[in-house]
Amino acid sequence: MSNLNEAKIKELIETAIGMRNYSYAPYSNFKVGAALLAKNGTVYTGCNVENAGYTPCNCAERTAFFKAVSEGVKEFDAICVVGGKEGPLTDFAAPCGVCRQVMMEFCDPDTFEIIVAITPEEYKILTLKELFPMGFGPADLA
């Protein structure tokens, strides 16, 4: 059961879908959009940005997180992630391992929600703990 209302879920999904238009993915043609909801209600967006060197690529989720953190925001409730080959979405796209690790840095794994969607009507919601059950985070270094 989500802590978000249906209208907010749909808003995040539609925003993430729209962010795919800004994706720079000339090598994979796998376009990803993200919409990150901060605890203060602000939505930070991101898209994936590829590079011929591959290593310097950045995922949509990290783009959204880094955008928020660069503006002083470090508390979050949820993120919506959508992705697939150029064109209409046909399947769910989950965050990669690096993005899950970034989420562990800033989010409570028991309450932070990850929405993976195909359309505003077809989506799944998981907690970070469900998606990354043995995640390593700041508490492990305390």
Residue positions per predicted region:
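Compact, glycine-rich, soluble single-domain proteins
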Residues: 48-60
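C-terminal binding/interaction regions
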Residues: 2-22, 73-142
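Short beta-strand scaffold segments in enzyme catalytic cores
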Residues: 29-37
